Design a protein with these regions (language model features):
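A short Gly-Trp-Pro
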Residues: 1-100
């Protein structure tokens, strides 16, 4: 079980089971949303339990980004498919994950 949270702790989450290796995305949307590239992993939606209120921004016709409404931490990227992407930096350490 891996856990993570936003900066202020208002949103926490737990991930049961395997997570994908961390990937770096340099697309325009990721850079504009964070001011840098994004390092993210993902897991099946049904393996992620979120506690707290996440604000979702529809960043494209096919994807939305989840962040904490209090501190603004980028937490999730929700696009097509069975997995929800999780920003690697919000996971509690150590993760045991490696970058692909």
């Amino acid at each position: 079980m891996r856990r993570g949270s936003c900066l202020c702790g208002a949103v926490t989450f737990a991930v049961a089971g395997e997570m994908r290796p961390v990937v770096a995305c340099h697309c325009t949307q990721c850079r504009k949303a964070t001011g840098n590239y994004v390092a993210a992993t993902s897991a099946p939606r049904d393996a992620i339990a979120i506690d707290g209120s996440v604000t979702w921004f529809q960043s494209s016709p096919k994807a939305r980004r989840g962040f904490c409404p209090t501190c603004g931490s980028n937490l999730f990227w929700d696009g097509p498919g069975a997995n929800l992407s999780i920003m690697a930096g919000v996971l509690d350490q150590p993760t045991g994950l490696s970058m692909e």
